Amino acid sequence: MPPAALQATVSESVKDAIISKLRQPPSAVPSREWSAETRTSLTPADAGIAEARASAEDIELVDLQHHNFSEPRKRIVSPASLSRFEHSQAFAEILAFICVCNTRVVGKTLTEEIQISSACRTILEMLDQVAALRESTPPDASIGSSRFGNPAFRTFYAKIRENTDRLHRMIPGLETDSEWSRAARAELSVYFQECWGNEKRIDYGSGMELNMACWLLCLCKLRILRLPEDGACIVLRIFWTYVQVMRDIQSSYWLEPAGSHGVWGLDDYHFLPFLWGAGQLSSHRHLRPKAIHDAEIVDEFAPKYMYLACIQFINSVKTASLRWHSPMLDDISGAKSWSKVNQGMIKMYRAEVLKKLPIAQHIFFGSLLRFPEPATGELEEEDVEEDAHGHIHPAGKPHAHGTGEGQAAGWGDCCGIPIPSAFAAAEQEKKRQQGNFSSTMLGEKPFGTGVRRIPFD
């Protein structure tokens, strides 16, 4: 299993210096609010109301043995279908799940003891087995100098597909061969399969991360996981383990950032660790958002807090300062408190993830997460199978794409900006300087001393 966070040895003298810094009053360092551009995207007129009132009661529970399951499929294919989703029960349940989990991690760290139910332990075992599948599937060393996704990812993805039903049989209540158990496993398996990346494009983004959240939400709806009781474990153990497994997958197979905003995004791949990570810190008495600029503080507290672990990870693969390679994170660090950051992250997730077609089109809808029926007189848009670039569009309305492999082909607006993997870019820079073959292709991790970080992607 990949480590919970990049560890750094901090001497006692450094710890004393950190404590001294934390005791400085907030006014000792100038603070600024998020920029006007950021605030505009985070504060739609109705944002904040639903988030503040969200509770576990907003999530409809179903009876596992008396529920009519159906295989999920993608239904968001146009702005019109996206609008229907925004006003649906599924939208409200996804947001409620995120907000309830957020409240359960306030003031908690990654290292403290928390209650872990038997169902949570089983899910952690499932993630361990996925990590083992990754370890047993080395990257393809024959691709040479390609800076885009490694085709061995498709082999790994096929192994996930082959083992998905077996893994779901590990979950209490889903191990039998009864009709309802098979149907439940089939519906859950779609979300689980899709949360590891896109097999065709060899990429990963917040849409795939959202599928993991939907999988966990569906387990809650089936009463396998329980909210709010399991909320802290869902985030601090299950989801964080998932992120570590994904970091291993991303760095091993050079997954391309799906739909990345480049330097104008939070992270090439993830969003929720920042949202829930800010929730962890929202009640901290000393740490302030500006602390992300202090390497000593980041190294000391990264093992405890997801947000700082993500900052440490970004700094491990990119050089220069956050202001240059992550201006959004730099801008957010000017907020007065982590509570403000957390509130902004929830609004941003609502506006920039759940309400954006390039990401929302990856959501699957079945019997647990239901897509709303069309209103009287409204036509149901016909969706089609995924095309060669791994997206779906209304029938007869595909857009043109260039030739090439993965995002190197140059997708349209719905498919994001073609950006090679930062891991691949760093490895290629090392190869250029040293003239030897990629260490990642030999099975090493790209975070050793021999890998040169890159300025930004």
From Swiss-Prot:
EC top class, as a word: isomerase
Catalytic activity reported: [protein]-peptidylproline (omega=180) = [protein]-peptidylproline (omega=0)
Compositionally biased residues, Basic residues: 391-400
Pfam families reported for this sequence: PTPA
Single GO MF annotation: peptidyl-prolyl cis-trans isomerase activity
The keyword Cytoplasm is annotated on this UniProt entry: yes
Subcellular localization, as worded in the UniProt entry: Cytoplasm
Known EC number: 5.2.1.8
Record-level GO BP terms: mitotic spindle organization; response to osmotic stress
CDD domains: PTPA
UniProt keyword terms in alphabetical order: Cytoplasm, Isomerase, Rotamase
SUPFAM superfamilies: PTPA-like
Family: Belongs to the PTPA-type PPIase family.
Name of the protein in question: Serine/threonine-protein phosphatase 2A activator 2
Species name: Mycosarcoma maydis (Corn smut fungus)
